Amino acid sequence: MNNKEFVAKIVDVAKNYKTLYVMGCFGAPMTEANKTRYCNNHSYNKKAARQAMIKAATADTFGFDCVNLIKGVLWGWNGDKSKTYGGAKYAVNGVPDVSADGMIAKCLNVSTNFSNIEVGEAVWMPGHIGIYIGDGLAVECTPSWKNCVQITACNCTKSGYNRRNWTKHGKLPYITYAKAETKKLESGNDIVWELMNGKHKIEISEVARAVNALDKAKTNPEYMSLYWILYKLVNGNG
């Protein structure tokens, strides 16, 4: 599974399924048998308020906690209400049963610098974990706010989303990460606009080709500073 496929599955859970925060649960539907099981499997779930929530859940509600959302999807969860764990199978696909802190310890290229985060990376803070889905957003399962699998703002403020300030991020070793695609642009104007707005990673050969066609950049003050930066880069003066 690659990072984009993984994120699509995670977002699908957040957007298209009824979910509830249930400690120790990796996607089980809230059948009567599962309610009895999870009301007694963990001290957190034994709290009166949490037990009331679990018992009130409909049978088409799936239980998750933060790290078990990630593990559940990697273990094959597919929203099958007829299966004990919603289609997931315990500890398959080479993915171990670890905690949130254990999962970030398994991750690669762990960093506190969020300027280079990629779609599908785990985002972490002590005792809690989620998945970055792009555009400054993450998916997490938390008892906070909506008490379910939900989309939140990742280390930024975005209208319509609750904000979570994560500490670290890293690549899950159980999926592959596609390299960022470069984009070939047809005109100098296009490439200047794309670079100014941070839309794409563009190869230097494309910059060289585009500089020769920068008609708008030469006349529009808004583009002038970037034009000279490009010119210097292409001519080895940057």
Where are the model-predicted features located?
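N-terminal capping segments
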Residues: 1-83, 126-128, 139-141
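Aromatic- and glycine-rich peptidoglycan recognition patches
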Residues: 1-20, 79-115, 126-184
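Extracytoplasmic/periplasmic, Sec-exported soluble proteins
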Residues: 2, 58-65, 112-115, 187, ...
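Generic structural signal of hydrophobic/aromatic residues within well-ordered alpha-helices
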Residues: 6, 10, 49-54, 94, ...
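Generic alpha-helical secondary structure signal
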Residues: 25, 42, 48, 89, ...
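Short, solvent-exposed alpha-helical surface patches in non-cytosolic proteins
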Residues: 67-72, 178-238
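A residue-identity detector for tryptophan
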Residues: 75-77, 124, 145, 166, ...
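Loop/turn positions that initiate beta-strands
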Residues: 119-121
